[in-house]
């Protein structure tokens, strides 16, 4: 499975960008993924319905992800709860080839991974399924992954119940990206070093303009 290289701006959802920005602030300290206990984004409780927490077992040839907790919206999309279940068993053999490699990429690279796929609800309406994966370390190895899932339908309403199991139509991948560029969070309104800034005199006198660079 191929992944493009992307900057944080690839993430569309404002809520997911907030989650990613909190992760980036922690990452920027030492250029490594943070520990999960450090991760305390604002309004986390509001997002819990759309989050899945995974623990990562690395004793097998490929990482094994197990679900200790999940949001209720996500369990409705898959048609069952996943608490205590491995990712492979949770999504099932039909969806595993489309889903599991995305998580493995996140674990292997210890970087955020973002994906978008079109799926059909039980009435045939096209729904964009946007998934953001955030890795967390313990003793230098990825031990946890948080998945944030957002759904969007251009036609308006859709049926989330059994969204990932409603019919035989498989997800149609639109984007798979490893977020490995611009791994920092720039606060709104801040000017980055080396950005050119122009200063002009006020009207009423001969107008001159000076351009400087911030270093």
Predicted features and spans:
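Intrinsically disordered, low-complexity terminal regulatory regions
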Residues: 1-81, 85-89, 97-215
